[in-house]
Curated annotation (Swiss-Prot):
GO cellular component: a single term: cell outer membrane
Disulfide topology: 810-834
Keyword annotations of the record: Cell outer membrane, Disulfide bond, Fimbrium biogenesis, Membrane, Signal, Transmembrane, Transmembrane beta strand, Transport
Protein's name in the database: Outer membrane usher protein FasD
Molecular function terms from GO: fimbrial usher porin activity
Name of the coding gene: fasD
Naturally occurring in which organism (per UniProt): Escherichia coli
Top-level taxon of the source organism: Bacteria
Gene3D superfamilies with a match to the protein in the record: 2.60.40.2070, 2.60.40.3110, 3.10.20.410, Outer membrane usher protein FimD, plug domain
Length: 835
């Protein structure tokens, strides 16, 4: 690795990143002690992107997506600009197999890469230490599907995590009172990339009245306990414990055992949901613009010839794509590509799988018909033209199932999927063999605003058993074995009404074998907003009928409206309050509720007051509650009066992370991992991603996205003047669930302008680098042409180190105790001799 004096290191960015062709820099202008004898060749700075060759730590991005942090060697290319040299194997699995011949070389230059990858590009930005590699989609390999390289993931530190919620209430009524308490916690423990998670709760209840002395009854439970670890090179996660299957074709089920599955969270965001491949031909260097619903979702330059584009993401399940191609001469041509999708659809070339092994586990059933172990496996892969093939199988001693399915894009007619499953169940010494068939359909009609989000139909023969049907047993419902699902139909429909809001319809019906039991549900709602006023109406029907069930028809009508209080009083007000009214009719009972809610001025609290009344006796109620949303704790306190009942309720919730020698507390959930900002036990430092450091000098940041680069920035605008932060922005690439400490070096001290001279009385050379000894060179400044340097965060006494040229340096001791300062804003002048 090449070594250079500090001054040249500082100048690499200052000169190289702003140079233009033909610039020339006189070495004598840089520092008086860097002369001709040193024979420095500064011509490398006279080219755009020029600089000193050698190793650098950089962030590598592929097609504008973060890939990894790595140390690369750099050399000056033919143009004079710095170009990275990649190690052998760097492009393994980044490039598709026909373009991997470069991996056989020990070192891969930028020129090697460009010669083998058509339309490829490499760009280095010295100022931010970033290397951008552009690779056409057709040439990308498996690793390019991932958010980042697994070797860049941060497993975090050993840590104990907890999310907790405590709640309770006390109810006083005519002849007595009752109390209940509920505590719920999500617990986690991380060690060497393994993550243990479990959920626990405690419930207690007691009641006092004329016949009850008030004995407390309580219960304590653990559930959903599992251990997991990521396997990056497989894009997978291994999980052991209390789990559930994916349920790709039929419904999922709970079990105890283990599974390994492809983790879609590791996928590049653009590949996590299905998006069609846009294909076309450009006659020249052209700009392709793709719109959906009038919104530009991608604009990309393409070279002459055929092109394929699929590196973009879409929201929703449908919506035609409008593709415009603008040629170099200004001419344009366009076409429409219909687009509809289904949840099962995957991007072309993206696969998914799951393999599970264990015993059935359903806490709702006291016993099972059969408890033999099972094997579950599923697989899916996306192909061209919106086709995704998928399958699943279950193999057990007395039960076997095989299911296959496929999706298909129908262009203007939407998207459809179909599946078929065969089951064989040996139950009560009798063989039952049956089939189940399913259809799904999705379509978006842009010009009318109609979206059939999902229409499904499933039919099962009389002898078809799902695994839940076969294994579960509940003695209280003996007929359940003969009451298996026969068919089910569901519909979800949305209709845009433009300025008049939107209309939504959800309906379903299902019936069963050997029974006329029918279950129906229907929901219709309409909502729209006008001038900050919101309206919503709804109707729902829940109907159950049949020989084995009481006829039950629940009809619910609802109306809701809200308006900002400022609209009513005609001016802005500090509480940002909203007045709302809600009315519901459930069969023959009508309930009305009026609510006023807003913020408590000058605090992190919100209030809510409501009054309710109905068309039944003693049904009126009034309620008042206050909620607190803090950085360290959330809480609420409420009081409700209903008839002769008086109810007081409360809740507290928050989170904590305990890791080596430190503790961090917060209000947001940490069970899925977090970054912990450390600021040398200094409190009150705000984090731009949310929160601020507590008295412990820590702040929890839970907005981190796993498997990709995240920035964490301190807010330096509001820190005290006697604090200095050398680097207020840091980056991490966490695994999911990881606890990653992010330490910031803060220096508490004074603001000083040092005037430094050498032993002969001459000022230190212009451009000399001065740093505080013991600060790891984080408190550093550059001498100006008068021999002065400004430094912040300076203690009362210490030593400064100055360096210039090759092996030219000196040190000066300082003591500021004799330099009184009335406030931290004052800048102190200090003169010293550097020896």
């Amino acid at each position: 690795m090449n070594k250079y004096p500090p001054l040249l290191t500082m100048l690499i960015i200052g000169i190289g990143s702003n140079a233009v062709a033909g610039d020339y820099f006189d070495p004598s202008l840089l520092a008086t002690d860097i002369g001709n004898n040193d024979k420095l060749d500064l011509s490398l700075f006279s080219h755009p992107g020029g600089g000193v060759k050698g190793e650098r730590e950089v962030s590598v991005y592929i097609n504008d997506f973060f890939y990894k942090n790595v140390t690369l060697d750099f050399e000056n290319g033919i143009s004079g600009a710095l170009e990275p040299i990649f190690p052998s194997g760097f492009f393994d699995n980044i490039l598709a197999s026909p373009y991997r011949s470069i991996k056989e070389k020990e070192l891969i230059s930028t020129a090697d890469f460009l010669s083998l990858v058509p339309y490829g590009m490499v760009r280095f930005d010295q100022a931010i230490a970033r290397v951008d590699i552009s690779i056409p989609q057709a040439y990308l390999g498996r690793d390019a599907q991932m958010k980042s390289a697994p070797e860049s993931w941060n497993q975090g530190v050993p840590a104990l995590l907890i999310d907790y919620r405590l709640s309770g209430s006390k109810n006083k009524y005519n002849y007595g009172s009752s109390q209940n308490f509920y505590a719920n916690a999500f617990l986690g423990f991380n060690l060497m990339g393994w993550r243990l998670r479990t959920t626990t709760n405690y419930m207690s209840y007691n009641s006092k009245d004329l016949y009850n002395k008030g004995e407390r009854q309580g219960s304590f439970n653990f559930y959903n306990t599992y251990l997991e670890k990521d396997i990056g090179y497989l894009r997978s996660t291994l999980r052991l414990g209390e789990l559930s299957t994916r349920g790709m074709i039929l419904e999922s089920f709970n079990f105890k055992g283990g599974k390994i599955y492809s983790n879609d969270e590791m996928l590049n965001d653009r590949l996590r949901s299905y998006t069609p491949t846009v294909r076309g031909i450009a006659s020249s260097q052209a700009v392709v613009t793709i719109k959906q619903g009038g919104v530009v979702i991608l604009q990309k330059n393409v070279p002459p010839g055929p092109f394929e584009i699929n590196d973009f993401s879409l929201s929703g399940y449908s919506g035609d794509l409008y593709v415009n191609i603008k040629e170099a001469d200004g001419s344009e041509h366009s076409f429409i590509q219909p687009f509809s999708t289904l949840p099962e659809m995957k991007r072309e070339g993206v696969s998914g799988y799951e393999i599970s092994l264990g015993h059935y586990n359903n806490s709702g059933a006291t016993q099972y018909y059969n408890e033999s172990p099972f094997l579950y496996a599923s697989w899916s892969r996306g192909y061209r033209n919106g086709m995704t093939l998928y399958s699943e199988t279950i193999q057990s001693r007395k039960y076997q199932l095989l299911g296959v399915g496929s999706t298909l894009s129908l262009g203007d007619f939407g998207a459809v999927s179909g599946d078929a499953s065969l089951s064989r169940a040996n139950k009560y010494d009798k063989i039952h063999s049956g089939q189940s068939y399913g259809l799904k359909y999705s379509k978006n009609k842009v010009d009318t605003g109609t979206t059939v989000t999902l229409a499904t139909y499933r039919y099962s023969t009389k002898d078809f058993y799902s695994f839940n049907d076969f294994v579960s047993k509940n003695d209280s419902v003996q007929y359940v074995w003969d009451n298996r699902l026969k068919n089910r139909i569901t519909l979800s429909l949305n209709q845009s009404l433009d300025d008049y809001g939107s209309l939504s319809l959800i309906a379903s019906q299902q019936n069963y074998w050997t029974s006329d039991y029918v279950s129906r549900s229907f929901s219709l709602s309409h909502s729209f907003g006008w001038n900050d006023i919101f309206f919503s109406t709804s109707f729902s029907l829940d109907q159950k009928e049949g020989d084995n069930a009481l006829r039950n028809n629940n009809k619910v009508f609802g109306f809701y409206s809200s308006i900002p209080l400022s609209k009513l009083i005609g001016k802005n007000e500090s509480t940002y309050s909203t007045l709302s009214y809600n009315v519901t009719k459930i069969n023959n009972q009508v309930r009305n509720t009026a609510t006023l809610a807003g913020k408590v001025p000058g605090s992190m609290a919100q209030y809510r007051f409501s009054s309710g009344w109905a068309n039944t006796e003693q049904s009126s109620n009034k309620a008042l509650s206050v909620n607190w949303d803090g950085d360290l704790l959330d809480g609420s306190l409420g009081y409700t009066s209903s008839g002769k009942n008086r109810i007081t309720d409360y809740s507290l919730s928050g989170s904590a992370i305990l890791y080596p020698w430190r503790l961090a507390i917060g209000s947001d959930s940490v069970i899925n991992g977090a970054a912990v900002v450390e600021t040398e036990f200094i409190s009150g430092i705000k984090v731009r991603q949310g929160g601020e450091t507590s008295l412990l000098g820590t702040a929890i940041v839970t907005s981190m996205q796993p498997y990709t680069e995240n920035r964490i920035d301190l807010d330096t605008q509001n820190i005290p003047d006697d604090l200095f932060i050398s680097n207020a922005s840091k980056k991490i690439v966490p695994e999911k669930g990881a606890v990653v400490p992010v330490k910031y070096n803060l220096f508490k001290g004074k603001q000083i302008v040092f005037s430094l001279k050498r032993y002969d009385g001459t000022p230190l050379p212009f451009g000399s680098v001065v740093s505080l000894v013991g600060s790891d060179s984080e408190i550093t400044g550059i001498i100006d042409d008068a021999g002065r340097v400004y430094l912040a965060g300076i203690p009362s006494k210490g030593i400064l180190h100055g360096a210039w040229g090759y092996n030219k340096s000196c040190e000066v001791s300082f003591n500021l105790n004799g330099k009184p300062s009335n406030n931290s804003n004052e800048i102190i002048e200090y003169e010293g001799v550097c020896k």
